[in-house]
Amino acid sequence: MTDSFNAKQFLSTVTSQPGVYSMYDLSGTVIYVGKAKDLKKRLASYFRAQVASRKTEALVKSIHHIDVTITHTETEALLLEHNYIKLYQPRYNVLLRDDKSYPFIFLSGDAHPRITSHRGAKHAKGDYFGPFPNGYAVKETLALLQKLFPIRQCEDSVYRNRSRPCLQYQIGRCLGPCVAGLVSDEEYQQQVEYVRLFLSGKDQQVLNQLVERMELASRALNFEDAAHARDQIQAVRRVTEKQFVSGDREDLDVIGVSFDAGMACVHVLFIRQGKVLGSRSYFPKVPVGTELAEVVQTFVGQFYLQGSQMRSLPGEILLDFTLPEKTLLAASLSEQAGRKIQIQTQPRGDRARYLKLARTNAATALVTKLSQQSTVHQRLAALAELLGIQAINRMECFDISHTMGEHTIASCVIFDGNGSVRAEYRRYNIEGITPGDDYAAMDQVLRRRYGKALEEKKIPDVVIIDGGKGQLGMAKAVFEQLEVPWDKSRVVLLGVAKGVDRKAGLETLFLQPHGEGMALPPDSPALHVIQHIRDDSHNHAITGHRNKRAKVKNTSALELIEGVGPRRRQSLLKYMGGLQPLRNASVEEIAQVPGISGALAEKIFNALKH
């Protein structure tokens, strides 16, 4: 506790109702968030003579003040606790560092439905299948579905503006509903129904319908249709035979845990309709001294209660660990889902098999992660020794990308002691400079990045500039001119110049904007980490530049038309499927775009034609 915090006086004011408490340090930063059925009893436990762990002891020493929020029920307190943890990211809480929404497969409710991937809120009319563990799993499934059931995957704007079928129709991957006469509505809807059944896990029902269709076509001597049905039957059977399917065909999430060397891995298997859709490993941030029970309890709560509108809750969650607050957590999840959610810790049969698989995956992923982390630590230690500093806790790298001076983008990527910190990668639009002036672009991004107050943990030990002596000299001049409250003198500036052939391993490093610089051997661990962060920075800049260039290309022609603002530009491009289809459209077709009058459509038509 800090000298200004009087625990005895504070506890005398605390209620015994359920609620959430937030602990702050001297700087006003939230360092821990917790919840309690009885706030007074729970908070008093922190200030006993014998505390539970080293982590609690360190936490209590840092407390400057505590805020309390009273709730009606313990369930409400649990939900609020996880919202606060997500908001404040306290350093003494176990933190789930990956809170992205999961992708689903979406089958639209259009007259000719489209199948595609979807993330985020489910506002559009149609059917959602999932969740899938990552975008790659969705992409693979969509590619498979396209081979089995040829329904469209194109954007609505493209579908509405086609006058002839695309390549997907030519190679048999789409029935071509965009062009009248290629496929009947009944035939298309039949294929859509097959997709719906297949994604719902009703493979046998799909096969039964296809067999019936093949037999009917054969009896009617329609051998071409019979052959198509036969080919679909064979394709579906090949796919379904490859996957283990649970007999109960329920929706499950299976969670396995592994813990070693202060690091935890939580592996989640996603099972829908008895099929394993995929899996994903998580490595929550675990404060020193945290018990494994708290890690698992907190992970499960954060995983399902934070941003749960983006997540599809299964009917049952399997764990290989006994949760202290299992009943409370199940009640909270059931309340969120509007139906009963079970948490099972002693499964049998197929469920036990799934749990063993999750445990094995967690252990394997943890071994791999620890090995990778060890390699990163070794490389950073080698670089720190090379630069003559004690350690590298944070490193940032900058790169510039443009095409002939146009659409300039600067990137900043960050590494910490464990490697890349992708959540903190940033891009900067560079404006107001002479086109192609990389020095001015670097000057601008460095001033924007560092010309402000920085938290202690955000101050880099090393800043890498992707460029030679000239860029490094400019960067040093910028840092000399900075007037900031943090210690800028601790930052080591390092210039990295590519060799004449621009090949990896031939880089020259500069610590000063003069002299010969130094070259490291190709097998140098220090060089490897420099190449890693430099390549990440380059790729991040290139991607941002390409996105900006594409956006400008699509909108520049419309920006000159009076009466067409950002919203109308977006609406026109989305409805028409891009600038080229818009250029080819008639006045009447343009007038069909929502928000575009006949007069404005004529103005747009004339402007794009001339």
From Swiss-Prot:
<dbReference type="GO" id="GO:0009380">
    <property type="term" value="C:excinuclease repair complex"/>
</dbReference>
<keyword id="KW-0227">DNA damage</keyword>
<dbReference type="InterPro" id="IPR001162">
    <property type="entry name" value="UvrC_RNase_H_dom"/>
</dbReference>
<keyword id="KW-0742">SOS response</keyword>
<feature type="domain" description="UVR">
    <location>
        <begin position="204"/>
        <end position="239"/>
    </location>
</feature>
<dbReference type="Pfam" id="PF01541">
    <property type="entry name" value="GIY-YIG"/>
</dbReference>
<dbReference type="Pfam" id="PF08459">
    <property type="entry name" value="UvrC_RNaseH_dom"/>
</dbReference>
<comment type="similarity">
    <text>Belongs to the UvrC family.</text>
</comment>
<feature type="domain" description="GIY-YIG">
    <location>
        <begin position="16"/>
        <end position="94"/>
    </location>
</feature>
<dbReference type="InterPro" id="IPR010994">
    <property type="entry name" value="RuvA_2-like"/>
</dbReference>
<dbReference type="InterPro" id="IPR050066">
    <property type="entry name" value="UvrABC_protein_C"/>
</dbReference>
<dbReference type="GO" id="GO:0003677">
    <property type="term" value="F:DNA binding"/>
</dbReference>
<dbReference type="InterPro" id="IPR047296">
    <property type="entry name" value="GIY-YIG_UvrC_Cho"/>
</dbReference>
<keyword id="KW-0963">Cytoplasm</keyword>
<dbReference type="InterPro" id="IPR000305">
    <property type="entry name" value="GIY-YIG_endonuc"/>
</dbReference>
<comment type="function">
    <text>The UvrABC repair system catalyzes the recognition and processing of DNA lesions. UvrC both incises the 5' and 3' sides of the lesion. The N-terminal half is responsible for the 3' incision and the C-terminal half is responsible for the 5' incision.</text>
</comment>
<keyword id="KW-0228">DNA excision</keyword>
<dbReference type="Pfam" id="PF02151">
    <property type="entry name" value="UVR"/>
</dbReference>
<protein>
    <recommendedName>
        <fullName>UvrABC system protein C</fullName>
    </recommendedName>
</protein>
<dbReference type="GO" id="GO:0009381">
    <property type="term" value="F:excinuclease ABC activity"/>
</dbReference>
<dbReference type="Pfam" id="PF22920">
    <property type="entry name" value="UvrC_RNaseH"/>
</dbReference>
<keyword id="KW-0267">Excision nuclease</keyword>
<dbReference type="InterPro" id="IPR038476">
    <property type="entry name" value="UvrC_RNase_H_dom_sf"/>
</dbReference>
<dbReference type="InterPro" id="IPR036876">
    <property type="entry name" value="UVR_dom_sf"/>
</dbReference>
<dbReference type="GO" id="GO:0006289">
    <property type="term" value="P:nucleotide-excision repair"/>
</dbReference>
<dbReference type="InterPro" id="IPR001943">
    <property type="entry name" value="UVR_dom"/>
</dbReference>
<keyword id="KW-0234">DNA repair</keyword>
<dbReference type="InterPro" id="IPR003583">
    <property type="entry name" value="Hlx-hairpin-Hlx_DNA-bd_motif"/>
</dbReference>
<dbReference type="GO" id="GO:0005737">
    <property type="term" value="C:cytoplasm"/>
</dbReference>
<dbReference type="InterPro" id="IPR004791">
    <property type="entry name" value="UvrC"/>
</dbReference>
<dbReference type="GO" id="GO:0009432">
    <property type="term" value="P:SOS response"/>
</dbReference>
<dbReference type="InterPro" id="IPR035901">
    <property type="entry name" value="GIY-YIG_endonuc_sf"/>
</dbReference>
<dbReference type="Pfam" id="PF14520">
    <property type="entry name" value="HHH_5"/>
</dbReference>
<comment type="subunit">
    <text>Interacts with UvrB in an incision complex.</text>
</comment>
